[in-house]
Amino acid sequence: MAEAFTTVPAKSSPARFRYTKANPVKDPTTSFAGKTILITGPNAGLGFEAATKFARLGASKLIFGVRSLERGQEAKTKIEQLTKCKRDAIQLVQLDMGSYASIEKFAKSVTDEFPVIHAAVLNAGVAPPSYKLSQEGWEMSLQVNVISTAYLAILLLPKLRESGRAIGEPAYLEFVSSTGHGDVTTESVRDGKSILKKVNDPANFKFTAQYQITKLLEIWAMEHIAAKTSPKEVIVNSACPGLCKSSIGRDFGIVLRGLDAVFKGIFAQTAEAGSRILVSAVTAGTDSHGGFWALDAVSVPGELVTSDEGKALSKQFWAEVLDVLRKQNADVEAILNG
């Protein structure tokens, strides 16, 4: 039955939600003994549940990229209590995905401090209910979910490539995506001048659509980064946990939070069930390189990922992202190209 959803273009639907809730993927059992796993956004929801699984499966080191060290410490303590992992297994490194300077500092810190990184799970994401600019001048979800995630991924590539060569098997770079990317229409992103400016325009902001758009752009970014990366060194993929009861709606108002709770009460699986995909994605193998991992299978992404029109838009988008990042870091393309 899963093939009914993995072999056709990804798209949200009640049928897909019901199937995923009723048929959660198997809980991963692969050992991560001796491995170092980096995960952003591990304080709550999917990130917390995935981090807990990595700890239970024996990861020697867990690097937590956290905006709040206080909240990171709370998550660390709770995971230590739940899994009985060693007290020095989890290390907190501050990371504000709304700040290029913080991203650069984080990437340098983990590159310098850890001999190898076996997998990086880029889970941090936001879904603000109203328009808000980041300090870098972009709408917050566009900043965090897309531009900053792409920048962090690129800055981590040298360490991941080096790690893959050192351990004799590919490291992993995982983007956390959403089936909702398949719901995005061409009109939502196509613009005669600039895709980023269109998505950044407050006049176009609708919070549900905006989150889905950022997840489409994130998949486009993943594909371009994967195209510049050998899967013999780093497997780059995108993982969709499915609709989950997670903390992504933490900034919603009372009414919206109530509606969200009712909808997810009917259709959503638990964050624990969804987090299984985040863990299995870093064992998915070379077939998942540049791919969309959902329901524990390499799946067909949305039409704006696979169609000729989507590929043309993706190419334009990526050129714009590199233009933005080049202004922050003149070496960004050299780093990406390895």
From Swiss-Prot:
Pfam entry (one): adh_short
Keyword hit for Membrane: no
The protein's name: Short-chain dehydrogenase/reductase phmF
Transmembrane segments: none
Database matches in Gene3D superfamilies: NAD(P)-binding Rossmann-like Domain
Function summary: Short-chain dehydrogenase/reductase; part of the gene cluster that mediates the biosynthesis of the mycotoxins phomacins, leucine-derived cytochalasans with potent actin polymerization-inhibitory activities and monocot-specific antigerminative activities. The first step in the pathway is catalyzed by the hybrid PKS-NRPS phmA, assisted by the enoyl reductase phmE, that are responsible for fusion of the leucine precursor and the polyketide backbone to produce a 2-pyrrolidone intermediate.
Active-site residues (renumbered): S177 (proton donor), Y211 (proton acceptor), K215 (lowers pka of active site tyr)
Entry EC number(s): 1.1.1.-
UniProtKB keywords: NADP, Oxidoreductase, Virulence
Protein family per UniProt: Belongs to the short-chain dehydrogenases/reductases (SDR) family.
First-level EC class: oxidoreductase
Any GO molecular function: oxidoreductase activity
Metabolic or biological pathway: Mycotoxin biosynthesis
Keyword Oxidoreductase: yes
Lineage: superkingdom: Eukaryota
Residues annotated for NADP(+) binding in this entry: L46, R71, D96, N123, Y211, K215
InterPro entries noted in UniProt: NAD(P)-bd_dom_sf, SDR_fam
